[in-house]
Design a protein with these regions (language model features):
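Transmembrane helix-loop junctions in multipass membrane proteins, especially transporters and channels
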Residues: 28-35, 75-79, 117-124, 165-172
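Structural signal for membrane-spanning alpha-helices in multi-pass inner-membrane proteins
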Residues: 70, 160-164
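Generic alpha-helical propensity signal that fires on short helical segments
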Residues: 33, 42, 73-81, 129, ...
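Intrinsically disordered cytoplasmic terminal tails of membrane proteins
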Residues: 1-3, 77-89, 163-191
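N-terminal helical submodule of small eukaryotic multi-pass membrane proteins
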Residues: 1-81
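Juxtamembrane membrane-interface segments at transmembrane-helix boundaries in membrane proteins
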Residues: 1-2, 37-56, 84-96, 127-145
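Alpha-helical transmembrane segments of multi-pass membrane proteins
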Residues: 8-26, 55-67, 91-118, 140-157
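Juxtamembrane loop segments immediately following a transmembrane helix
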Residues: 37-41, 112-142, 170-180
Length: 191
């Protein structure tokens, strides 16, 4: 089955939007604190039931799907015309957006996964020393920050896809002269 760039951009943006929404909902549903119960020589923390752990993992999975779909969409042979990856990496603008999309995707994954795993550990290991006065919870705002980075990554993948389409059209239209045309186009846009 042949895909078009529009279909691929819809897949990328759908996965990214779902990741963003799940991350925001996970941040909002996260327990603010646990209730400490003093027992013999320790404190047992009782945390309310919340869906933030499952939502955090789902947000992470959809972010990975967005990144994979974004990467795949850039190098996909549209209209049956395959181009070498080296052709795309001749464009400095494309390189910048491609690398920033990868970086924000990685940061979004870290910001989503870290508090999710931390919260899961807090729910699993509930006993703390008697000196504990407050039950620990993950830092507030990390899941929301991960959700925003996920949305940023999605938008950057879409920009990288648009730049890849421009590189593809220039190379197909101008052939081997496409590299010279690409260099002239970058010089004219930077001036």
């Amino acid at each position: 089955m042949a895909f078009t760039a529009t279909q691929m951009s819809l897949v990328v943006s759908s996965f990214g939007l779902v990741s963003f929404i799940l991350g925001i909902v996970a941040e909002n549903k996260k327990a603010q604190s646990g209730t400490p119960v003093h027992k013999k020589g320790s404190v047992i923390c009782i945390y309310p039931s919340d869906p933030s752990i499952a939502l955090g993992y789902l947000s992470f999975i959809f972010l990975l799907a967005t990144t994979a779909a974004g990467y795949y969409s850039i190098f996909y042979p549209y209209k049956g015309k395959f181009l070498s990856q080296s052709i795309f990496f001749r464009s400095k603008t494309f390189i910048a957006f491609f690398n920033i999309a990868l970086l924000t995707g990685g940061l979004g994954a870290a910001f989503t996964l870290w508090p999710t795993i931390e919260e899961q550990n807090f729910h699993k290991h509930k006993a703390y020393p008697i000196t504990t006065e407050k039950c620990p919870t993950p830092k507030i705002g990390l899941l929301g920050g991960g959700a925003l980075l996920s949305l940023d990554s999605t938008l950057l993948w879409l920009v990288a896809l648009m730049l890849a389409i421009n590189v593809r059209e220039d190379f197909i239209e101008y052939g081997d002269e496409g590299e010279n045309h690409l260099a002239r186009a970058e010089i004219s846009t930077s001036i």
